[in-house]
Structures are given as C-alpha cells and as structure tokens.
Amino acid sequence: MAEFLRSQILGTTFETTNRYSDLQPVGLGAFGLVCSAYDMITRQPVAIKKMMKPFSNATLAKRTYREVKLLKHLRHENLIGLSDIFISPLEDVYLVTDLLGTDLNRLLTSKPLDGKFVQYFTYQLLRGLKYIHSAGVIHRDLKPSNILINENCDLKICDFGLARLQEPQMTGYVSTRYYRAPEIMLTWQKYGMQVDIWSAGCIVAEMLRGKPLFPGKDHINQFFLITDALGNPPDEVIERICTKTTLDLVKSLPKRQPAPWATLFPDSDENAIDLLGEMLIFDPDKRISAAKALEHPYLSVYHDPTDEPVAEQMFDWSFSEVAHSIDEWKIMIYTEVVDFHDIGPTEEPVITEPFLSPDPSLSPEVLDPLGQIQTQSMVTKSAETLDQDILQYLQI
C-alpha cells in the first residue's frame, strides 16, 4: 500500500504518495490547487492537481468524475496527459499530469510573438481541437491560460473541467468573456463545437496583435466590440440563435459595417488573416472546422494528414444523464482510479537527461531543484521543422 506524505501548500493540506517530492505551488483556482513535483520513478517533473472538496456536493463530485474520465479517454500529443491518479486518506482526488514550463497567457504578456511562433502554435491548437471534437467533446473554456507550452514550442491544451458533450440544449455560463462565442452570449443553451473554433480564433488574433481582440468589460460591451469588427449579425442568424429577449435587443442595435481584417492586423500574414476570417464568423454553421482549418494555406508548412489523428472512440457521456448521489459518484470515481492503475497510462514514461535552461523570462517556474527542465519533447517534428532563429529566440 502506498505511503502518503502530508504537506501544507498555500494553507491547503496536500497528501501525496511518497513517489513525489519537492512540491511547489503553481496555481490556485476555484476547483483545484496545482503544484509542481518531481516523480522519483520516471525522474520527470510533473504537475499534481488537488481537486478541491470533490465530495462536498453532487455537482462537484460529478465535475470531478467528468474530468477524470476525460483525462483518461483523451490521449493526444496536444492535450495534457494523465500519468497518475490517486485518492488520499482524506478522500481528496489528485491528478498527475505533464508539467510544461509556461502558458500562452504568460508568454503573451512577456514579449511579442514572432509570426513563426503564431503559426506553429495555431497549428498545434487546431490539431488538438480536431482530436477533441472527433471524440464528441467540446472544451468550452479555451483561453491562453489553458494552453501550456514548453521550451521546445510544444503546445498542450489543458483544463477539461467545463468540457461537455455536444447536445441540443446546453448550459450557458462557459468560457472566459474575451473568448466567448456570440451564440453563447445570445442564447445561453444552444451551441456546438463551433464555440471552440471561435475561442481559438480569438486566441490566434491575440497572438497576432499582442492583446485581446474583444476585451469586453461586460456582456453588452463584449458584443459591441464584436460587431465593431464583424458588423451586425445577419437577421437569419440572430433569428436562429437568439432567444426572444436577445433577438429584440440585437435588432435594435445601430447598424455597423464590418471592419476590413487587414486594418485590424496591418502587419500580419495574409493567410493568417484569411484563416481568422473563417474562424470568427457570426454564423456558427459557417465557421470552419478544426479539421478543415488544418488544411488552410496558412498552416501548409506543418499540415500532415497522416499525423493529425482523431479519437478511436467517441467519449461515453451516458453518466451525465443520471442524477447520482454523492456516495454513488464516489464509488464511480474510485472505480475509475482502480481501472487506471489496472490499465496504466497509454504511453511508457520517457526518461531524459538534463539540459540547458531556457530564458527565465519565458518560463519563470520551469526548473526543478536539480536544474532539469520540467518538460520533455512532445511533437518530434517540431525540432525538425522549427528553424534555428526560433530556437535561438527561446535560447535553447
């Protein structure tokens, strides 16, 4: 039986197995505390997320179960990978995943991104989205802080706590405002995978501009900023996606003409602007899919249809159709933990040798106590494809 060690991290009790050492706080959110740690079996740095009060009510228990199931099911190079999961003596749930040096939000606030970075990050983001959507999953909370990046320019999408099945009726409060699709603001219940494409488009635009494209102060201001760029939504679109209340409001707005994309991104690649124009469209049915976006000329240098996999199976959402008690959710989570350890992660752990640190301003929390980089190369073709000036930019 595993031995557990107890630590106090930011006033929170952290109970981890003796497999992990050198815990350091990385981030604290509403639903979990994340620490970096050192895995003494694989000799790799990892991230350990403690799910906050997972069994305090049925809603949090369901959310915990959903995230565990999703991380077990979704296995892709551009998604955060689950390497371990355990339940502590205090009955807290801990998820152990890859640890990458920084996230896109931190990167965007540290220095402007060169166009080659924007192109490669866009490719990986859409490559990951293609896989997620092929599993019948909508992320629903894509934003720069949920996009992790390491010193090799490898990108992984994380935080599936809000992910959902695509279905006709869906709850509305999802995604950070700046990256929220207009159909979510206008209808609050009817939307699909296209909301992720909108969010991804906002992220690409932010990489190109160096600042958010639609930094709304509230929902109304957010929608006005969108219409400043795209013009008023067509009547047939708002009649399809709006509720009666929002329909009257949108139709009463002053008429605005769309702004030429080139004026919003004067120094950007024409192909990048063209792709943005296909991602940021009011009508969700006309938005480009992730799979089609990968075929766009802007991404032709990286596009490889033989290396852009889809999920082998659709994700099983049947658990969401039943109202379980807290004890039932607890048993289901325990079962998933046992199943994970019976099967194990799909990939063998990779042991790497220490190498030089990247620019500290890029990855301020990237080093473990031994001076090793807390990442490993993910997409092997990145080292082959990125040219030398990109590597020098990251000081690798």
Curated annotation (Swiss-Prot):
The modification Phosphotyrosine is found at Y173. The keyword Cytoplasm does not apply. The modification Phosphothreonine is found at T171. A motif (TXY) lies at residues 171-173. Activated by tyrosine and threonine phosphorylation. Pfam families: Pkinase. Signal peptide: none annotated. Belongs to the protein kinase superfamily. Ser/Thr protein kinase family. MAP kinase subfamily. HOG1 sub-subfamily. This is Mitogen-activated protein kinase mpkC. It comes from Aspergillus niger (strain ATCC MYA-4892 / CBS 513.88 / FGSC A1513).
